């Protein structure tokens, strides 16, 4: 797998600093905004168990065992982001529902598993990267399904940075084409045509550049997710931002 050459990348600081200023704003306002001194917190995350009414909930169609872990960062907006994500994904785990009698035949599996773990991966100036690792096993299934989502925060502006904010307007398809060329051998080996490849909304900043992550089975019927790096891609042509050094 190829990766982007360091000389072709926008520094991480630069990308994150200007993300919040995307749009039609006067240059003068942009200059004064970047000149402002912003206190960037140092993230120190502690893994904690999420408090839910019960670890195992039984309904008529079976029981589900929950294992939920998050992080405490002393940044309320970050901590709330992950809790709210879990509440949306697993509403039954947070609802104080009384157990019901399971109506599944005794000779059939009735216990499902669901786990979500949040982990802090690292910080580079105003960029903080986390990972949400999920695993679900439906009762009676041949195997469970796992997924890892990377979450990137701009600490100076207190916001989650999505791919739609990261990629310049009208450049999504051109970036897709460049990604395909950079990873063409692997993609062709798995019979994946250019029009089937999309710029993933799951990404992280690697040592040498941005890496787009594709979950299980999205690109091919295989047990490993695929990491699609942009090689020989001039990222400044696609990614929002201008270089700015930390002072």
Model segments located where?
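Bacterial N-terminal signal peptides that target proteins for export
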Residues: 2-12
């Amino acid at each position: 797998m190829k990766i982007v050459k360091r000389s072709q990348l926008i520094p991480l600081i630069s990308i994150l600093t200007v993300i919040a200023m995307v749009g039609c704003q006067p240059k003068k306002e942009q200059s004064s905004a970047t000149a402002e001194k912003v206190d960037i917190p140092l993230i120190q995350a502690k893994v904690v168990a999420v408090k839910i009414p019960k670890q195992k909930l039984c309904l008529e169609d079976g029981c589900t065992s929950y294992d939920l872990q998050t992080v405490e960062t002393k940044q309320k907006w970050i901590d709330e982001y992950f809790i709210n994500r879990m509440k949306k994904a697993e509403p039954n785990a947070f609802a104080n529902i009384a157990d019901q009698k399971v109506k599944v035949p005794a000779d059939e599996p009735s216990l499902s598993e669901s786990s979500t773990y949040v982990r802090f991966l690292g910080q580079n100036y105003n960029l903080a990267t986390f990972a949400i690792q999920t695993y679900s096993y439906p009762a009676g299934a041949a195997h469970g399904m796992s997924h890892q989502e990377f979450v990137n925060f701009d600490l100076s502006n207190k916001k989650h940075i999505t791919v739609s904010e990261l990629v310049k307007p009208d450049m999504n398809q051109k970036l897709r084409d460049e990604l395909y060329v950079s990873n063409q051998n692997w993609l062709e080996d798995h019979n994946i045509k250019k029009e089937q490849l999309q710029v993933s909304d799951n990404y992280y900043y690697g040592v040498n550049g941005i890496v787009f992550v594709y979950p299980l089975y999205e690109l091919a019927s295989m047990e490993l997710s695929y990491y699609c790096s942009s090689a020989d891609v001039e990222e400044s042509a696609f990614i929002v931002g201008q270089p700015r050094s930390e002072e």
